Amino acid sequence: MLSCRLQCALAALSIVLALGGVTGAPSDPRLRQFLQKSLAAAAGKQELAKYFLAELLSEPNQTEIDALEPEDLSQAAEQDEMRLELQRSANSNPAMAPRERKAGCKNFFWKTFTSC
């Protein structure tokens, strides 16, 4: 997680430095290609997006809850349930789902699952 943050910070820093150098320099097509590639690489970071979503959702809303009237507390509870649901969906990874085996299937080969 720390290395991902560090990579993103370095990518952002390099983009800022590149943009700062571009303002005074003549237009170079190689520089444009470099910037486009670096922006495309930074946009594909799904883990970073999940992390920021989880961090945003985990921030406490205690001041909002204190300001609500008693009838609004049920709405706050529903919002908390929705927030927990979003956290669960952000943290779930379908690629890591455990393998399901049908009844009667046996593992004959010790390295892999057999298909039944």
From Swiss-Prot:
InterPro entries: Somatostatin, Somatostatin/Cortistatin_C. The keyword Disulfide bond applies. The keyword Secreted applies. Keywords: Amidation, Cleavage on pair of basic residues, Disulfide bond, Hormone, Secreted, Signal. It is found in: Secreted. Residues 1-24 form the signal peptide. C-terminal amidation of the neuronostatin peptide is required for its biological activity, including for the regulation of mean arterial pressure. Residues 25-88 form a propeptide. This is Somatostatin. The lineage of its organism: Eukaryota, Metazoa, Chordata, Craniata, Vertebrata. The gene is SST.
